Each structure stands twice: as structure tokens, then as C-alpha cells.
Regions:
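A short helix->loop->beta-strand "cap" motif at the edges of active sites that frequently abuts
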Residues: 146-153, 219, 318-327
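Adenosine-phosphate binding glycine-rich loop
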Residues: 319-395
Length: 395
């Protein structure tokens, strides 16, 4: 890994406008802007390892809005806020005036008087999560423009119906660390494959995030799933266009074995079919509990037809030299451990368990880098100042 000074030099050489926009989809950011987030994250991680404080805010709130359950991302966001010197406040919509009809515009302004960051997870409703984030962003823009807010908080997508940028960027940071550089990722084959799970309704945003980001860096990306387990068509088109622009490739197959063959990286992860998620969204909005039960039963039966989509030792033998890097956003459905039959065998997961933990360890720094890059036009100069002051972190 590069030194902090080398990372700062790289950051200063990049052309970025991240301080002027929210980080909601990776494919809305330029290659330089993606690299800036990676480099700032790496610098923050290195500074913390040297026990140097990275508290760039003396006060301020970081608001969290979780409309779905979370462990890793929730704690990663809290860690990122603390890393930068912000205090966390969770917005419980059930205990707020939102439950009584308060508008998004009003809520966004009322919670932001002293806020420097807002992180939102909203992945339950297909076609709604990312749109909600943009509505919040527009309300914040208006509040700042009208003089209601003294500053415009950074808005971070902590997972929506379309993308999971903090996850995919953490995955990319781990790949850069593992393989040595972004340049070394060119030509590497990554297999983003569906895998069997005894549960249904898992979001599309993780596989969509992977194909939408890894195609930006000249990788050979293979998306594999049984027939009918499609992703959002628009995101698949994004991946195709990205691959053409980066000199990589993108293809879709309906065989896990074909995807794993000669792969350098494998990412076996369950998700619900796009059409099912559309139905589920309609039923959730209609509060149709019986319809949801029927859909779940139907989907679990459909999943059960594909139990052979299982990351086993034999499947891993098909990869390059039998030693592909296994990745997962966690928690994985581990056969015989967290479930009877799932995405991956205990043996394969145990072999790569520490690797997946290191993968996850990048997320707090990625989130912190997104916030810092939105709030400061020259993050390189700020990091240089932190290094110069070298104030020891209070343990």
C-alpha cells in the first residue's frame, strides 16, 4: 500500500467535483472521483493505524435513516462519523412526526440545522429508495439556498433499490489492496453469481452495485443466475456500456460452473428476481399480508429448484488455479452453520472468512471518505494538515 504522502499526492492530481454533488450511484461519478474516494479512504485508514486523529469536524451531527435492518452498514456509518468528529443521531421515523404526515421537505430541513451528513438506507421498495434520496437532496438544496440551513449536509446512499455504493466501493478498495493496484484489476475475471438461499426478497442492489462498478476498471465481469433471476434491465445496460468504455467485458450466463471457470474472484450471493421485487413492492404498498405470504411461498419453492447453485469446494476448483478470491457482503448463508442449505459451504467460507472480514473493514473508511469529499473541496490539503499536526488519537 502507498504511504499517506503518496496518497495525498495522488488525490491532489485528480479532477473531482464530489464537493458539489451527493454520492448516490457509482456510475454517476467519474473515474477520478471514484479514485478520490478510494485514496481518501486509504489515507484515513493509514492515519488511524498510526494513531493520528482524523477529526476534521469540531462539532456537528451525522443523521442516519435506516428503513431496513442493518448491522455492518449501521456500525460502519457510526464509525465513519466518529472518525471525522461528528455525533450520530438516528431518525426513527415511527417516533417522529413523519408518522403523522410530515413532508420529506420539512423533515429534511428540520433535522439538518446542525447536520453535516445524512446517511440513508432505503431498499425495500423497487423504484422508490433512490428516488426518496433525491427528494431529500432537493429539499436540502432548497433549504440551503433559502438560508434555512447554514450548510448543505452530505447525503450518502447506504443502500437503495438500485445500488449499494458504500458496499461496492469497499469491495473495490479490498480488491485494490489484495491485488496491489487498480491497474492490476484489468483483465481479471470476477464472477457475480446468484446462489441458493432459504430466504427470499434479498435486494438486487449488491449484484447491481458490483456489475455497475467493476466494469469501470477493465475487468471481465460475468453475471450468472438461473433463468428468471434477472436484475434491473437499466443497470445491466449500464454495465455493458461501462465495459465497452473501460476495455473490459461483461457477459451474462445461466451456469454457475461457467461463471466460476478460470475466475480470479467469485461473489456468490442470493437475490430475488427483478419481477418478484416488482410484485413485492406492489404488495407492500397495498399492505397485502396474504399476498406477501403467497409470494414468499412461491419464491421459496422457486429458489429450492436451484440448490445446486452452491459455492462448494468442487466449484472453487473450477476457478483460476483453484484459488479465486471469495467475496461476500455478509452475512453469508453458510450451509450447516447459519442454515441447513445455503450459498456457501462451511469449508469454503472458513478458508476465506478473514478475507471477507478485511473486505468489510473498508466500509467505515469509504463512508468517511464520501462525507469528507462532499464537505471539503480540497481533501488532499486537509489530509496533509492532519498529517502535519499529527495529533494523537485519544484511545
Amino acid at each position: 500500500m502507498k504511504t499517506v504522502n503518496e496518497l495525498i499526492k495522488d488525490i491532489n492530481s485528480l479532477t473531482s467535483h464530489l464537493h458539489e454533488k451527493d454520492f448516490l450511484l457509482t456510475w454517476e461519478q467519474t473515474p477520478d472521483e471514484l479514485k478520490q474516494v478510494l485514496d481518501v479512504a486509504a489515507a484515513l485508514k493509514a492515519l488511524r493505524a498510526e494513531n493520528i486523529s482524523t477529526k476534521v469536524f469540531n462539532s456537528g451531527l451525522g443523521i442516519s435513516v435506516f428503513r431496513d435492518t442493518s448491522t455492518r452498514t449501521r456500525f460502519s456509518y457510526a464509525s465513519a462519523l466518529n472518525l471525522l468528529g461528528l455525533a450520530q443521531q438516528d431518525l426513527d421515523e415511527g417516533k417522529s412526526q413523519i408518522a403523522h404526515g410530515e413532508t420529506v421537505r420539512e423533515t429534511a430541513n428540520m433535522i439538518s440545522f446542525c447536520a453535516d451528513a445524512i446517511g440513508i438506507r432505503d431498499d425495500m421498495y423497487l423504484g422508490a429508495g433512490n428516488a426518496y434520496m433525491r427528494e431529500v437532496g432537493a429539499a436540502l438544496d432548497d433549504g440551503y439556498k433559502q438560508g434555512v440551513l447554514p450548510q448543505r449536509p452530505a447525503l450518502v446512499n447506504l443502500q437503495c433499490d438500485i445500488d449499494h455504493p458504500t458496499q461496492s466501493m469497499a469491495d473495490l478498495a479490498w480488491l485494490r489492496e489484495h491485488f496491489g493496484s487498480l491497474e492490476n484489476l484489468k483483465g481479471k475475471k470476477i464472477a457475480m453469481t446468484w446462489a441458493y438461499s432459504p430466504s427470499y426478497g434479498k435486494p438486487l442492489s449488491v449484484p447491481q452495485g458490483i456489475i455497475g462498478l467493476m466494469t469501470r476498471f477493465g475487468m471481465d465481469v460475468t453475471l450468472a443466475h438461473p433463468e428468471g433471476y434477472d436484475l434491473i434491465p437499466d443497470v445491466v445496460e449500464v454495465a455493458k456500456n461501462n465495459a465497452k468504455a473501460s476495455g473490459g467485458s461483461f457477459r451474462q450466463v445461466t451456469s454457475m460452473e461457467e461463471a466460476f471457470k478460470d475466475a480470479d474472484i467469485v461473489y456468490p450471493k442470493s437475490w430475488a428476481p427483478y419481477k418478484v421485487m416488482e410484485q413485492r413492492t406492489e404488495l407492500l404498498r397495498a399492505n397485502d399480508h396474504e399476498g406477501l405470504k403467497a409470494l414468499e411461498k412461491q419464491c421459496l419453492a422457486q429458489n429450492a429448484q436451484h440448490k445446486d447453485w452452491h459455492c462448494t469446494e468442487e466449484m472453487m476448483e473450477l476457478t483460476r488455479d483453484g484459488e479465486a478470491l471469495y467475496m461476500h457482503c455478509l452475512p453469508a448463508d453458510i450451509s450447516g452453520v447459519s442454515c441447513k442449505e445455503g450459498e456457501v459451504t462451511e469449508g469454503v467460507f472458513e478458508k476465506y472468512r478473514i478475507a471477507t472480514y478485511k473486505e468489510a473493514s473498508w466500509k467505515p473508511y469509504i463512508i468517511a471518505a464520501m462525507i469528507l469529499s462532499r464537505k471539503y473541496a480540497k481533501p488532499g490539503a486537509l489530509l496533509e494538515q492532519l498529517l502535519k499536526e499529527a495529533q494523537e488519537r485519544v484511545k
